[in-house]
């Protein structure tokens, strides 16, 4: 059985739409991603586009801990990319529920690789 281009495009479109909707419907329950950290360990003034250093704006939460403290996944997801850059040092980007990307930076080491699934915590 050979599919016409229209049917094939329709199937691809529906599959894409279902994937988007399912991603948005997945529940998101976050945990603090630094082992042993509490709400008292982050800088609430650095949240939501607060000016931060040379980068100008900063969207996220900085959680402070001793060097070498394990950093865990705030939610389950797929590792999109790992690497290093001058601003964030060693980092990991994870796509979680609701299509949100979680960026973990300033890591001493990275113990995962791209396109792997990680569990929360």
Predicted regions and their residues:
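Surface-exposed, glycine-biased beta-strand/turn segments
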Residues: 2-90, 119-120
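Short, basic/aromatic beta-hairpin or loop at an interaction surface
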Residues: 53-55, 94-103
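Preference for bulky hydrophobic residues occupying beta-strand positions
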Residues: 61-63, 94, 105
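Short histidine-centered loop motifs in beta-beta connectors
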Residues: 72, 82, 98-121
């Amino acid at each position: 059985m050979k599919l016409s281009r229209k049917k094939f495009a329709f199937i691809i479109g529906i599959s894409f739409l279902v994937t988007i909707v399912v991603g948005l419907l997945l529940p998101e329950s976050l945990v603090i991603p630094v082992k042993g950290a509490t709400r008292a360990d982050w800088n609430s003034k650095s949240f939501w586009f607060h000016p931060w250093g040379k980068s100008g704006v900063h969207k996220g939460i900085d959680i402070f801990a001793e060097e070498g403290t394990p950093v865990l996944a705030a939610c389950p997801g797929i590792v999109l990319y790992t690497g290093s850059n001058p601003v964030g040092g060693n980092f990991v980007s994870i796509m979680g529920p609701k299509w949100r990307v979680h960026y973990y930076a300033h890591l001493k080491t990275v113990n995962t690789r791209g396109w792997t699934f990680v569990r929360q915590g």
